[in-house]
Curated annotation (Swiss-Prot):
Gene source species: Staphylococcus aureus (strain NCTC 8325 / PS 47)
Sequence positions that bind Mn(2+): 27, 81, 161, 165
The keyword Ribosomal protein is assigned to this record: no
Protein name: Superoxide dismutase [Mn/Fe] 2
Underlying gene: sodM
Uppermost EC category: oxidoreductase
Any one cellular-component term (Gene Ontology): cytoplasm
Record-stated family: Belongs to the iron/manganese superoxide dismutase family.
Any one GO molecular-function label of the UniProt entry: metal ion binding
Length: 199
């Protein structure tokens, strides 16, 4: 069964002015689609073709060595972007159990955002910043390239794309501005669903 590029759950221009239509078109239709195409080419005709992407990434050490790097990069790229589209929304409301637990752990939502932003804006090169559930607790982590916290047994519930292709058309080298804009379009309802399922 071939992996498929998911449809966006909103229009390309729905996240404006925070993420522009042109960026969304390139990011989804070109970058994400390339990961899917390369992943399918890697796993075609193997047992991995019938495995879930989450299982494949969580058990990367069991992927045959000849395919491991491609699955790590392209499978990771497909998984990460698929989740990223889901946790974005033009209708962002800061509520839910995850918000309460963030406040309980960090003191305030702003303190959490500050720590998350600091990790995102100081990450060298390309990668992702994540809010994960690790042994029932919330934790902010970063990964390089298309790596994923699933490989370390952590469950991702929120993620921020730090690759330049995610923001350069609009923000150029101003990664902190892109980070600030991100909070206006977080789908906290989806984040909370993922959190409740992971606890």
């Amino acid at each position: 069964m071939a992996f498929k590029l998911p449809n966006l759950p909103y229009a390309y221009d729905a996240l404006e002015p925070y993420i522009d239509q042109r960026t969304m078109e390139f990011h989804h239709d070109k970058h994400h689609n390339t990961y899917v195409t390369k992943l399918n080419a890697t796993v075609e005709g193997t047992e991995l073709e019938h495995q879930s992407l989450a299982d494949m990434i969580a058990n990367l050490d069991k992927v045959p060595e000849a395919m491991r790097m491609s699955v790590r990069n392209n499978g990771g790229g497909h998984f990460n972007h698929s989740l990223f589209w889901e946790i974005l929304s033009p209708n962002s409301e800061e509520k839910g159990g995850v918000i309460d637990d963030i406040k309980a752990q960090w003191g305030t939502l702003d303190e959490f955002k500050n720590e998350f932003a600091n990790k995102a804006t100081t990450l060298f090169g390309s990668g992702w910043t994540w809010l994960v559930v690790n042994d029932g607790k919330l934790e902010i982590v970063t990964t390089p390239n298309q790596d994923n916290p699933l490989t370390e047994g952590k469950t991702p519930i929120l993620l921020f794309d730090v690759w330049e292709h995610a923001y350069y058309l609009k923000y150029q080298n101003k990664r902190p501005d892109y980070m600030t804009a991100f909070w206006n379009i977080v789908n906290w309802k989806k984040v909370d669903e993922l959190y409740q399922a992971a606890k």
